[in-house]
Amino acid sequence: NSISVLANMSCFEECVNMYRREQDEFVWQPKISVHLNLLEGISLAGAENVPDLVNRDGHFKLSWEKLFFISFLPSRNKFKNQLKKEIELQIKTVVDAFPELSFKAIRIDSHQHTHMIPVVADALFEVIGEQKWQPEYIRDSREPMMPF
């Protein structure tokens, strides 16, 4: 019942425009979910602001496993602060593209469930708290075994 939107993909604007052109034709209006992407594509924050997350060209360079490992390192706060910048920008980009959303109605998910990695989860919840956002939904790992 929702559409996941990845703000940092090259087709983002094209997808937003496609949705806008077709939205009146939908039988029901889907909810929009921010699909955080910290593993692929280009950082919205820019290489100069998140140098430990991206390569020289601004493409994400860390794997799921590396992010998990970083969660337990003494240097985790350095990474967490950079993750916060990227997470905040990705959420704001989606909300700006869909003004009918509010920060109280946002739904949050992530590519490969990275938002459940400890350092990423800490960054996400700090951003939510600092911005005083009240998400409607944050996906967790409790998935139904059967669809019915």
Question: What are the roles of these predicted feature ranges?
Answer:
Residues 42-78:
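Active-site gating loops and adjacent loop-to-helix segments of metal-dependent hydrolytic enzymes
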Residues 67-107:
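Hydrophobic alpha-helical segments and helix pairs
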Residues 13-33, 48, 52-58, 95-101, ...:
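Acidic (Asp/Glu)-rich catalytic clusters
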Residues 5-15, 39-45, 111-119, 146-147:
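Acidic-and-aromatic substrate-binding clefts and catalytic sites of carbohydrate-active enzymes
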Residues 3-5, 30-36, 106-110, 138-140:
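Hydrophobic faces of well-ordered beta-strands that scaffold small-molecule active sites
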Residues 90-148:
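Catalytic domains of cell-wall/extracellular-matrix polysaccharide-remodeling enzymes
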